[in-house]
Amino acid sequence: AAVITVGPNETVTRIADAARLARDGDTVLIRAGTYRGEVAVWTQKSLTLRGIGGRPVLVAAGQAAENKAIWVIRGEQVSIDNIEFRGARVAAGHGAGIRFERGRLAVRDCVFEDNEHGILVANFEDMELSIRDSIFRQAARGGPLPAHLLYVGRIARFTLEGSRFEQGHGGHLVKSRARVNDIRYNLIADGAGGEASYELEFPEGGDATVVGNVIAQGPATGNPAVISYGAEHGRWPVNRLRLAHNTLINDGPAQGPFLRAWFDRLPADARII
């Protein structure tokens, strides 16, 4: 496996060139700096992408790989560490910092700011997403659709740990359709200037464990409930929401419920624990 280093003083100066050069098992190191319009599609089966010497900032600057995102990920096993994604927008309203379409993706110590979606995930039931120690903030404004800071599709497993979400707009801070969700020790708080709907939503139920988080709705919320479970239907064989050791705060004007569980739309054996 090779190591490819990207930077203004390196042999490879453009991220898109690194995406074409990289092979399965390679590591791509991106030096700190601002990279404007450096969009890319990554299809290698196994790949490590890491910022070095500080956190590189990828600014969409009106560009989108495949008219989808700053980066499109379609590998079997990919890790992304220490990268910042900013300003993703497309005409359809689904512009993402990362569009994750196949395989298993691990995101660590990354920042997503001013995107229509921070990460947008496809619907394949063998996919897995893990996010740790990352920041999602300042959802894009003025787009044709609600902007979710994180939108997880119908995948096998979603893990979220040690991360921060703030300042949504129109959409939700965290929305997941995954079969299994493990959400621990995060700060999910809309805060000043935020106009999110739900802070945490599981529209199709699933097996969700939510432990040790601070989840807070702001005064300009678009929805009175903080957490929503099963608003559309129950898609998965296990529909169970486990809440433990969380701090829930509702500063919304309507003082709505901390949790709304849509039992009329879920199977009879759905449980809240």
Predicted regions mapped to residue ranges:
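Extracellular beta-strand-rich solenoid/capping regions of secreted or surface-exposed proteins
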Residues: 23-24, 35-50, 57-81, 86-104, ...
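Acidic Gly/Asp/Thr-rich repetitive segments characteristic of extracellular carbohydrate-active
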Residues: 3-37
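Extracellular beta-strand/beta-solenoid scaffold signature
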Residues: 61-71, 91-99, 114-123, 142-153, ...
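Short, solvent-exposed loop/turn elements at domain surfaces
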Residues: 13-15, 56-59
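Soluble non-cytosolic domains of exported or imported proteins
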Residues: 9-13, 74, 101, 237
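Right-handed parallel beta-helix
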Residues: 50-56, 76-87, 104-114, 126-141, ...
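Acidic, glycine- and Ser/Thr-rich low-complexity intrinsically disordered tracts
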Residues: 26-29, 44-48, 57-58, 65, ...
